[in-house]
Design a protein with these regions (language model features):
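Short, charged low-complexity intrinsically disordered segments located at boundaries
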Residues: 68-69, 85, 128-129, 148-152
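Conserved small/polar residues in nucleotide/adenosyl-binding loops
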Residues: 168-170
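Non-catalytic accessory regions outside enzyme or core folds
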Residues: 1-76
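Long amphipathic N-terminal alpha/beta scaffold segment
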Residues: 59-101
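Short, conserved "active-site rim" segments that organize catalytic pockets and cofactor/ligand binding
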Residues: 87-141, 146
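Active-site alpha/beta core segments
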Residues: 135-165
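Short, functional N-terminal and low-complexity linear motifs
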Residues: 21-27, 87-89, 152
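Short, charge-rich amphipathic segments
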Residues: 45-71, 105-125, 153-156
Length: 170
């Protein structure tokens, strides 16, 4: 599958999961398709999904991230040993871990296409991230206290881990 076919497969699969949306027309324009895909990923509840979807999603997201350009921490200059300050697209940072400004449920922002760090990280990591967060929270049995964090694999992000830090919402 080429990138366009992968994107269409992902969109159709996510639409098929939502009975009220399965007849949603898919835009012909690739940029509008990307917006629709991101929105569908943003509203998807944590749940298992088939292996074929994950394989296509992983290839697609990794390709999209590579096209944005990956920033490797080894090319940055630390301000102190082991401490780096960097500004840019956090979903392109290749390092040990990035920090997600999360809500107390840790499963992400469910507002479609909302431009927040939580949505960006959950979108480019893939649907596995939300499920991993849900599993951690179910095991814990209560919302994450403000100022506390949980760590998950980064899935399709170039970093190794995501630290989900529960913050106060003002």
């Amino acid at each position: 599958m080429n990138p366009s076919e992968k994107r269409l497969f992902l969109i159709q699969s996510l639409l098929d999961e939502r009975p009220t949306c399965h007849r949603q027309p898919i835009p012909a324009d690739s940029e509008r398709q990307k917006i629709l895909l991101r929105g569908l990923m943003n509203v998807r509840r944590p749940a298992d999904i088939g292996t074929e979807f994950l394989q296509v999603q992983d290839a697609y997201l990794q390709s999209e991230t590579a096209a944005k350009g990956i920033t490797d921490i080894t090319g940055l200059v630390p301000v102190k040993p082991g401490l780096y300050i960097w500004q840019g697209d956090i979903t392109t940072l290749k390092c040990d871990a990035i920090v997600n400004a999360a809500n107390s449920g840790l499963t992400g922002c469910y507002i479609p296409n909302y431009r927040c760090i939580d949505n960006a990280i959950h979108t480019y990591a893939g649907v596995e991230l939300r499920l991993a967060c849900e599993e951690l929270m179910e095991k814990q049995g209560y919302p994450e206290p403000t100022g506390q964090a949980k760590m998950t694999p980064a899935f399709n992000l170039p970093c190794r881990y995501v630290l989900h830090l529960s913050l106060i919402h003002i």
